[in-house]
Amino acid sequence: MYDKLFEPGRIGSVELRNRLVMEPMGVGLANLDGTPTEEMIRYYELRAAGGAGLVIPEICRIDDETGVGELRQISVTRDRNVPQLTRLAEAIHRHGSKTFLQLHHPGRETPNVLLGGKPVVSASAIPCKKTQAETRALSTEEVQHIVQEFIEGAVRAERAGFDGVELHCAHGYLLQQFLSPYTNKRTDQYGGSFENRLRIVTEIIAGIRERCSAGFALGCRVSVEEFLDKTGVTEDYIHTADGVKICMAFEKAGVDFIDVSVGLYETGITCVEPVSYPEGWRHDIIRAVKEHVSVPVIAVSAYRGPDVPEAFLEEGTIDFAGLGRAWLADPEWGNKMQQGRVPELRKCISCLRCFESLEQNAEKCMPLECAVNPECAHELRYGELPIDVDHHRVVVIGGGPGGCQAAETAARRGCKVTLLEKGDRLGGQVLLAERPPRKEKMDFVPQYYETMLPKLGVDVRLGEEATVDSVMAFEPDAVICATGGDPIVPGSIPGIHGENVICVPEALSRESYEGGRVVVVGAGMTGLETAEYIADKGAASVTVVDMVTTPAPGTNQTNLVDLMGRLRAQKVELKLGEKLVEVGADGITVEAVADGERSQVEADLVVLSLGNRPAKELAEGLRKRGVGVCLVGSAVRDGNIAPATRGGYEAARGLFSARAARSSFCMDSADLQKFGAPSVMSDQRGLYLAYTTDPSAIERILPAPLKPFSIPVVTLSVNHILRPSFTDDYYEAILGVYCYLGDQLGQYTMSLLLGGNGAEMATQLGRDNGSMPKKLGTQFSIRKEGSALCVDLARRGHRLVHVEADLGEYNSPLCHLIFQSPAAGKTTKGCGFYYHFDRPALPQGGAHLTGGAINAALVQYDYHKWEPGYVTSIKMESSPDDPWGELPVLSVLGCAYSELDLTVLGEKKLADADAVEFFPYVFAGWYDRTTLGEAGRV
């Protein structure tokens, strides 16, 4: 059916099985040292298995000083990264796909914080108008050094087993900053004339050709058009004719392919298109390049289904179809097309949640997420869906994204699923979201579920509103409520219930507003899109009112810029910083937030866009009847497609899970029903290590009122204390997480294990015996031989920790900051949070928990030695008594071998705490389950 898409092709000497290319796109899955994580390898392997003929992983760093583009980004700056990159290439090759590595330097398009606060670099000292970071021009010598770094990166890529490399000369990054007269004002050999502006790239091409084998593919991704006139720029920049000329020059210099793109950060709306851009919109630009080069052309053009790229191949506009976000949404994109399963395709809706989440999640060291594919970038963590061998009956209430995803997931597990939807079509709020102009792609969501749910055997009942009795009639084993929410109507405002007031659902259902004057209250994206819809339907005037001072705060800026441009063209007026105080027959009264001045806005109709209040009544009624109910989507909190889809997936995935005994720092309260002086630790030697974990793991085990630190950092220390002030020498291992109590930052100790001669006395006299968790009987091994460090920790016959490290440098410079930049001769101070409780005896016998408190240990570290370490291997494992593996290692920041003196300066009570509430969280850190279980206490 799509013969051209699946026709074999060739780039240079590299044979490709089809014409489908997975274009590079950052996902945030690399280790902080630039090596691929196991999760990243799995992510790309699935796309190769899903039919991509060529996989180009995300931007790859070639310079660690000025070239950091993302916190978690793969890198070819060091030889030590090659073995793990080899594993990535091998995983892709395993499925018959080929892989190129994209070599990248961001130049000025990166935040200063990723460079340690230093100015970003560029061809000239011209800041990017989007990032607005302080910018300096590279010296001639620095440019020549970067040329060599690109070449060395290609050499390492070939050694790692990649089939080729792509130079990122697009999207406004460093190489494009040299190519464009807009950003290159240099007067040396790398600026001025057309040839000079291209020199940095042509020198890289020549160097790679000299150092790499003849069969190693080499190409350039080029922004052929910068579109800067759309932003009011009058200076010269790369126009399409210039871009074509650049591509021709690169072909002459020796590249094997051109990957056509457009734009830069300042015109980012053209680089990563929002929902309003149609498939294939770049056709003429791509065609212009294809007509002037003879090497293969790869190009993206917002392809969502197979028809447009097939047509482009048929007419000779492209040689290979590049897809980016489409592979996020459906890793089986290629296979489904080749097997004729087009209706089963989960299409990208161009909502840009992926890019929005990539930025939001970066500070938490977490990857992006996809609004329509809940497994995206978490494939390894989730693993295969658990099969429900008992075929439980599940009723899903609500046919929005959350309910549909829950139904799909439960059905894939083998459950018997019935979905009740009161409307006449699946989709829920998405059916309204697709009503505004240019949002037709939103219909991809219901289209997918309308195909897949019947195919999976889900009993879909449209036009059937659920009640407690109707649901109970199915005798469900579980119910998933995706009942959405009801529009918020602030009843205290006079006139709010008038006949001239409606909410968004009704507003988007009307087909005409011809000649009407309309006010929309609420300047979030929903309100703004509703205003556009009303203007498009013929309203004489549309005004948007809100208390906020900027439209749609917190919204993805690309989507907002796109929408605001259209609203201006439609003359939609925004009155921001104004609070609605009254609704009248002829309009509304608003009050300025700044000074309280009131004014009138004339209107025939008032539309409220103030969000939704979760509809939980049905769920509460079912719970009273003894049914297990999960709430998902807007029935939990008002939100968009992404959390609804993820919530539906996780709710259905977790149903009927085997409740076998598991290791955890947090125990159910039902499992528990049976159940000093400042210290000096001189000459303390051993390991300090930091890594990032899943934020949800910390949230699950952190007792209130402690709040997680913005970066989910776990610290591990394993030390031999040779000269403590209160006992003989002993060994100590601490597992902790950074967190806040109010404004106070500190470390919360999850577990403290002791071993050695003085360990038993240390539990009695060391630190604050009443609030620190301590366990004996641990075996320690700390071996340092030259620059090699190896640490092992075991207890009660179970290995808990194994670490191997090479001393000399960290995995990430962030490690140094986490430990407050230690150095020999330096003193630092810290705070540790610990819980205290009393257990007074009862007159009738027994005891109870009371007197709960959070204490702080204020400590001082006096360093004699601090040797940074690069962790080459780490394993954190759990036993029934010590759940040290419950905080999974996502990315290692680094470690150090230290020699120091630690002094506990004092203890103080910070806050009262409910002993009964927090005790389930501290139990595993203080007591052994195995021992108490054998004694019948738990």
What are these regions (language model features)?
Residues 1-397, 401, 409-412, 416-417, ...:
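Flavin-dependent oxidoreductase catalytic cores
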Residues 23, 102-104, 168-170, 176, ...:
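Generic beta-strand/beta-sheet core signal
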Residues 51, 669-671, 686-688, 695, ...:
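Structured soluble/peripheral alpha/beta segments that form catalytic or ligand/cofactor-binding pockets
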Residues 53, 163, 256, 319, ...:
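Conserved acidic residues
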Residues 388-422, 461-475, 482-555, 591-658:
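Rossmann-like dinucleotide/flavin-binding elements
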Residues 416-456, 509, 531-578, 636:
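Rossmann-like dinucleotide-binding cores of NAD(P)H-dependent redox enzymes
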Residues 659-730, 869, 873, 877-879, ...:
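N-terminal domain-onset segments
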Residues 769-938:
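Interaction-surface and assembly-scaffold signal
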